[in-house]
Amino acid sequence: MTLRAVLFDVDFTLCRPGPELSADRYARIAARHGITLDTSRYDDARDAAVLNLKRHPELLHDESIWHRFTEEIFIGMGGQEAIASECATEIEEGWGVSENFELFEDVLPVLEELRRAELRIAVVSNGIRDLQAFVAHHRLDVDAIVDSRSHGRVKPHPTIFQAALVLLAVAPEDAVMVGDSIEEDIEGARALGMRAILIDREERHPDVHERLTDLYGLPAALGLARPT
């Protein structure tokens, strides 16, 4: 392997949702409809919705599936099925706004360090927002942008990784995938012959091989010389 490129997941790898995309946003929208949600149930509701999302083995990007995903979180927090779709539409509008996401503090300095090492960089993401606009807003210096919305398949489908590799003009064995999802990012990339490193910011997976708790350790994990 000759390292030539690094592919990054986006959500919870490079950025986190800001206040406008938190459980409180669900609660505020529900309150306008006279519904009280239990924000303490957000994490469990989201985990359950993720499990249902994985029941679509064809791995097609389908906006109706993402809409249902948001509805299920709303219902899981105590919302009513009758108004779930309307509330989900309002919630999803916030996910399309680049300003509603905050970069982790380690992102820009680490991307700069990868550039100094003359590595090519891509972002590969599942989701419904305009990733080109997100990259431009946050001034991410990348060579390739691939999202499920434009590609048509979601990670861990091999073609979404392959699309990024083609744009970067590198072979799988010469690239590394960095992401926070074991199934979507790590297993998906390794199945294609790529090296993959889990970014585990909340330290949920201590037993995973090749794991970092922040991006500051990535250059060393890649064997890059530290700048002098």
Label the predicted regions.
Residues 1-6, 16-17, 37-40, 82-86, ...:
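Asp-based, Mg2+/Mn2+-dependent phosphohydrolase catalytic module
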Residues 2-108, 116:
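N-terminal helical cap/lid subdomain that shapes the substrate entry/recognition surface
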